[in-house]
């Protein structure tokens, strides 16, 4: 097999300077959803690179269920909706349908969804787990159901995953903020527990700041007024680092923030969309790429579904999609 034949949809999209979704539509014959010039450009690149669509995966889709379960920790989060779009853009190109199941930040709900997926005829699963109990996931592996984790890692299980560079980018961003300028550092996050994403972000922050106050809350219960009673939001020496965009937006839209002059940045965090940049155009944030993470997770799953003799566990992939502080 040549290098050209190993190209993915993501590669074709980059070469054509279009979105993954646009390439997916082209492959599905949905030419009415793009300009003729775009269609011709994609066609030219596919011809020049000898790109071969994974026909084995397409044939598999005809022989088994074409449903893929996508179990999200909470679809109210911008991150979840963005990565689901990325997942669907790839699955649809191979004849699969993504079925979104919302755990709603509730372990019992997640467990019920996983039981349902296990007992139903799903081709595979892409999971953003709340649980850190590897036994819950292991039975899928034992049943040989293809599974890919997104935004999470489980250290004691060997399985495919797509994450971002949480530790490295958190450490880098903190170093860029002139640490000596701050006397107090407060991290605002949903409950950390043992969730790998949150644990590694906090660890990255603590490599730069020795003393860090971690406030755990839930997006739907976050009260900025209550936070203001313990943290002086107007004091430029107080740094706030928010690990979820939804929490960050609640801070950026609060009157106490809107009334500040913002000569010095004292709020930053992880973001998934451009909204925080409109609210604080002079601030830098840690920009994730959830759409690309979702598309990458779907591509891995398609490869697993195409594995000879369903022996996908011999082809484990752990992909890191870098986030950027900008």
Listing of model-derived features with the role each one plays in the protein:
Residues 1-65:
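N-terminal helix-turn-helix DNA-binding module of bacterial transcription factors
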Residues 173-213, 309-326:
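An alpha-beta-alpha
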Residues 78-93, 169-172, 196-211, 250-254, ...:
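Short, solvent-exposed amphipathic alpha-helices that sit
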Residues 162-187, 223-229, 288-308:
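Hydrophobic alpha-helical segments within soluble ligand-binding/sensing domains
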């Amino acid at each position: 097999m040549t290098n050209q034949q190993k190209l993915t949809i993501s590669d074709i999209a980059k070469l054509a300077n279009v979105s993954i979704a646009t390439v997916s539509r082209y492959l599905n014959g949905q030419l009415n959803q793009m300009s003729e010039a775009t269609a011709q450009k994609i066609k030219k690149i596919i011809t020049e690179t000898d790109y071969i669509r994974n026909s084995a995966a397409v044939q598999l889709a005809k022989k088994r269920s074409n449903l893929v379960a996508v179990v999200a920790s909470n679809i109210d989060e911008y991150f979840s909706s963005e990565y689901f779009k990325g997942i669907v853009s790839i699955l649809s190109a191979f004849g699969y349908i993504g079925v979104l199941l919302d755990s709603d930040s509730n372990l019992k709900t997640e467990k019920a969804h996983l039981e349902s997926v296990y007992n139903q005829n799903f081709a595979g699963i892409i999971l953003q787990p709340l649980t850190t109990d590897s036994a819950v996931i292991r039975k899928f592996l034992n049943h040989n159901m293809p599974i890919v984790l997104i935004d999470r890692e489980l250290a004691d299980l060997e399985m495919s995953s797509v994450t971002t560079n949480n530790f490295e980018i958190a450490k880098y961003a903190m170093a860029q903020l002139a640490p000596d300028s701050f006397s107090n550092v407060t991290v605002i996050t949903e409950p950390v527990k043992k969730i790998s994403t949150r644990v590694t972000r906090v660890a990255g922050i603590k490599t730069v700041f020795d003393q860090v106050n971690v406030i755990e809350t839930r997006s739907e219960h976050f009260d900025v007024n209550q936070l203001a009673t313990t943290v002086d939001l107007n004091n430029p020496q107080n740094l706030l680092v928010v690990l979820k965009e939804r929490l960050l937006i609640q801070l950026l839209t609060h009157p106490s923030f809107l009334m500040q002059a913002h000569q010095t940045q004292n709020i930053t965090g992880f973001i998934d969309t451009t909204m925080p940049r409109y609210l604080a155009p002079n601030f830098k944030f840690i920009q994730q790429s959830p759409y690309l993470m979702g598309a990458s997770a779907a591509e891995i799953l398609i490869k697993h579904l195409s594995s000879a003799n369903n022996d996908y566990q011999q082809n484990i992939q752990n992909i890191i999609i870098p986030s950027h502080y900008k």
